[in-house]
C-alpha cells in the first residue's frame, strides 16, 4: 500500500465518521484523497465491482455497447494515474471500466 501523509488536525476530527457512497469515478477520487490524508472511511457500492455507470455489467448502468468517452483521456485521467499508452485517445466504456479497476487496485481502494 502506498505511503500516506499524516492526517491534518481537521482531518483527524473526522476519523471514523466518513461513509463513502459509490465506487464510480467520483467515489474513487474521494477514496484516494481520503487515503492520502490518512483519513479512514467505509466505502459502500451497490454493485460488486468499481466503475459505476461505466461498468456495463452493473445492472444499473446506462452505458451502451458502443459508448466512448467524449473528452480526451488526457483531460479525463486522474493526474497521478495516467491511462495506458495503448488506450485510444477517446476510450471505450470497457477501457474506462478497466482504468477504474486498475486505479482501485493500484492504490488498494
Residue spans for each PLM region:
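Glycine-rich FAD pyrophosphate-binding loop
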Residues: 19-21, 35-61
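Short polybasic/polar patches that bind polyanions
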Residues: 35, 74, 105
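Helical element adjacent to the flavin cofactor pocket in flavoenzyme catalytic cores
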Residues: 97-109
Amino acid at each position: 500500500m502506498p505511503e500516506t501523509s499524516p492526517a491534518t488536525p481537521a482531518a483527524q476530527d473526522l476519523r471514523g465518521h466518513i461513509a463513502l457512497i459509490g465506487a464510480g469515478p467520483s467515489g474513487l477520487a474521494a477514496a484516494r484523497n481520503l487515503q492520502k490524508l490518512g483519513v479512514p472511511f467505509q466505502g459502500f457500492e451497490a454493485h460488486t465491482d468499481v466503475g459505476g455507470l461505466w461498468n456495463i455489467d452493473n445492472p444499473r448502468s446506462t452505458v451502451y455497447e458502443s459508448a466512448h468517452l467524449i473528452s480526451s483521456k488526457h483531460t479525463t485521467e486522474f493526474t497521478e494515474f495516467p491511462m495506458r499508452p495503448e488506450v485510444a485517445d477517446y476510450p471505450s466504456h470497457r477501457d474506462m471500466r478497466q482504468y477504474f479497476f486498475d486505479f482501485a487496485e493500484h492504490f488498494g481502494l
